[in-house]
């Protein structure tokens, strides 16, 4: 019974190989499966929301941009060529939606910065310093270190070459270090 029970339990646990599962979900969603896309949303939405919240500094705008991102992802899904690149592709869409959102608002002051959760003073200083960086530096740092994407995934999300990601990361870290001195 143990052998049969454990193999049945393993058959019911689809998350044994998450990357393969995600790729399979993308392929099924590309064929029109709403259920598969909903599962993808459950997997990627927290990371995309976190990125947008950090980028936009406003949770309400981040939620709106997340919805626009997911709608655009659903509509553009048939054009995605590599199913295993879904997250970087969605983050690329999110980057464009964040730019659109920032263009559409009038910035009143830095007092509207919304920080999620409790942070100690040094983490708050680091976050504030990151937010003062140019967008190209800030995006690379957020994607690379907060969302822990590889250099290749960051490059794909931002639509730039890997070498550009490396140089921006280096320059961003240097600029961040100068701001924190």
Sequence positions of predicted segments:
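Helix-turn-helix DNA-binding module
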Residues: 131, 135-139, 147-164, 174-178
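Internal acidic/polar
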Residues: 5-10, 15-22, 100, 105-130, ...
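C-terminal flanking helix
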Residues: 45, 49, 70, 134, ...
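Short helix-capping/turn signature of helix-turn-helix
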Residues: 43-46, 54-57, 142-150
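Arg/Lys-rich amphipathic alpha helix in sigma70-family domain 2
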Residues: 75-85, 92-112, 119
